[in-house]
Amino acid sequence: MRYVKVGSDGSGGSRFEEVEVGQVETAYTENTPPVLVSRVIPATGLAWVTLPPDVRETGWHPPPRRQFVVILEGEFELETTDGHKRRFQPGAALLIDDLDGQGHVTRVLTGGAASFLAIPLAE
């Protein structure tokens, strides 16, 4: 299992990175067969975020905090300062961690509202 990290490059820019999620076989709950489970990442909350139909692009921005994002509705494109662009559809998980510098651009590629879960991290 993987997620995409949008991180700072150390010189005020941002870049994409593929991150492998380590999992171990665990009896996750009683009376069920073992499943693969990752370590728990401490979070401080959860917010549903919706970009209304008239918001198609954000411009360059850093995130408000270090957070995981899970796409719920719509197709998003993120662009990093190194010129790379990636598209993300519902179900995609991203770690948005480019707190330093210019950040990234977010675009909505589909019509209508687009939404994601923002999960601020405690660490």
Outline where the language-model segments fall.
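Short acidic, Pro/Gly- and aromatic-enriched capping/linker segments at domain boundaries
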Residues: M1-S8
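Histidine-centered active-site/metal-ligand motif
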Residues: W60-P62, H104
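A short glycine-rich, His/Asp/Glu-containing loop-to-beta-strand
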Residues: G13-W60, A114-F116, A122
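Short, Lys/Arg- and Gly-enriched loop/turn segments at beta-strand edges
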Residues: A27, R86, Q102-V108
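Short acidic-glycine-tyrosine-enriched beta hairpin
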Residues: V21-G22, T50, T81-L99
